[in-house]
């Protein structure tokens, strides 16, 4: 889809990747609509304030989006948890699924009627390689992103012949504040490749412009996605060392 003249709603539009994406699409001639719980630094763009972890806020944001009728919705906002499932607070589990999966579904639902009436539109869901290669100690994050991947695939099939495209983009690790000190320690000890936010933003914009279906960013991670789908036990073995390193990082030092 040509970005010029298009209204693009972006959740997490004031974050590290979101802020860069807002500026990138604006330079392409699009009109960004920023959705964030943080104040928007640039007042010249339309701004919707709301916390995606709050279901009432999500409902209110959805109503505003229904009125704005964006051409493109980018579900970018997300949170991460690195740790053992048995130690993750239930409130944090609920919040993670709410932000990473439920909010994208509800906001998509809110914009679909206007897109169907117009006969065009695009839903862009930003997932993760972890959604296709679930990692130990990222259980809720991996499963939420796997859910977003399945949502994208099912919705794409449902919207056949409507003129609405659904794009799923799965980056590998990215250098952003979402990664806490322990995640960065894991990345260093396992030699995990991490991309700069600018590269991810360029790939997102390119995927939108080319109406891409599924985009997996990074090599060899994109190959492992296919291997894991066919031979998951092979990937189990390949990740065993990393899993042990993660467990050691998470073990309190006496």
Feature locations, PLM:
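C-terminal helical subdomain
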Residues: 168, 188-225
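Conserved NAD(P)H cofactor-binding loop of Rossmann-fold oxidoreductase domains
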Residues: 76-81
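Active-site helix of classical SDR
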Residues: 108, 144
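N-terminal Rossmann NAD(P)H-binding glycine-rich loop of SDR-like oxidoreductase domains
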Residues: 14, 18-22
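Residue(s) in the substrate-gating loop at a strand-loop-helix junction
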Residues: 128
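Substrate-binding pocket helix/loop in short-chain dehydrogenase/reductase
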Residues: 84-85, 89-94
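Rossmann-fold cofactor-recognition segment
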Residues: 42-56
């Amino acid at each position: 889809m040509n970005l010029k003249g298009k209204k693009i709603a972006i959740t997490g539009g004031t974050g590290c990747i979101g802020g860069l994406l807002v500026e990138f699409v604006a330079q392409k001639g699009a009109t960004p609509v920023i959705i964030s719980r943080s104040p928007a630094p640039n007042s010249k763009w339309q701004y919707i304030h709301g916390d995606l972890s709050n279901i009432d806020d999500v409902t209110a944001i959805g109503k505003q989006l229904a009125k704005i009728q964006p051409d493109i919705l980018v579900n970018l906002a997300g949170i991460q948890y690195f740790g053992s499932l048995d130690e993750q607070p239930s409130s944090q589990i609920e919040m993670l699924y709410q932000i990473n999966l439920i909010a994208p579904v509800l906001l998509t639902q809110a914009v679909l009627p206007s897109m169907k009436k117009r006969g065009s539109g695009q839903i862009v869901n930003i997932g993760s390689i972890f959604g296709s290669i679930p990692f130990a100690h990222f259980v809720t994050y991996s499963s939420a992103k796997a859910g977003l991947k399945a949502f994208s695939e099912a919705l794409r099939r449902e919207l056949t012949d409507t003129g609405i495209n659904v794009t799923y983009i799965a980056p590998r690790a990215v250098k952003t504040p979402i990664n806490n000190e322990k995640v960065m320690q894991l990345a260093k000890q396992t030699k995990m490749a991490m991309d700069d936010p600018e590269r991810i933003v360029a790939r997102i914009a390119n995927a939108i412009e080319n109406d891409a279906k599924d985009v997996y960013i990074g090599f060899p991670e994109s190959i492992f996605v296919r291997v894991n789908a066919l031979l998951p036990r092979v990937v189990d073995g390949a990740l065993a060392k990393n899993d042990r390193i993660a467990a050691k990082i998470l073990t309190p030092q006496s």
